[in-house]
Amino acid sequence: MDTVIELSKLLHDEEFKDNASCTSTPTLKTARIIESAVTGITLTASVPMIIIVITTMILYHRVAKHNATSFYVITLFASDFVLMWCVFFMTVNREQLFSFNRFFCQLVYFIYHAVCSYSISMLAIIATIRYKTLHRRKQTESKTYSTGRNIGILLLASSMCAIPTALFVQINGAKKTTGKCVVYLSSPKAYELFLAVKIVFSFIW
């Protein structure tokens, strides 16, 4: 119960102190500008390419419906596409080009961490399928009945892993309603959070 009360205090900004007046060194500012520029160039080049790849994979999946891997690849590139938009929103917010409210910040961070977990897990699944196919050439990929179930389970697990980050998103700015999105996690809360994750993984294992 004490943990729930402390968590509710944190979620209502009772422990978070605004740090909008904190100054940055010239080196740090330069590094952030370079990072934002590289991110912008990467997004500009990657988004059209991913759209082309997704369109091509959808057309291929319509022709080769027996191939379950193609549907996994489509969802993988779709998650990467969503991830890039999350990176775009996080970058423009960090550079203070746009100010977001707390709900939008939580939504962006939740989707960002969820699709990151999903992409990494989906890569592992695709690699496993390709490995099994190469070593069992007589086995076909016609069993697509479990594809939707596997994707649904993976999305649910990724969303559950992204919930803690979204809960600790705060607003850092002169205004209390909008500003820069930050993830504030005090040391005691971090210890309790990772302890809970450790217990959950121990039960699962």
Curated annotation (Swiss-Prot):
The keyword Disulfide bond applies. This is G-protein coupled receptor. It is found in: Host membrane. It is a multi-pass membrane protein. Its main location: host cell. It comes from the Viruses. Disulfide bonds join C105-C181. The chain crosses the membrane at residues 40-60, 71-91, 107-127, 151-171, 185-205. The gene is U12. Keywords: Disulfide bond, G-protein coupled receptor, Host membrane, Membrane, Receptor, Transducer, Transmembrane, Transmembrane helix. One of its GO terms (molecular function) is G protein-coupled receptor activity. It comes from Human herpesvirus 6B (strain Z29). One of its GO terms (cellular component) is host cell membrane. Gene3D superfamilies: Rhodopsin 7-helix transmembrane proteins.
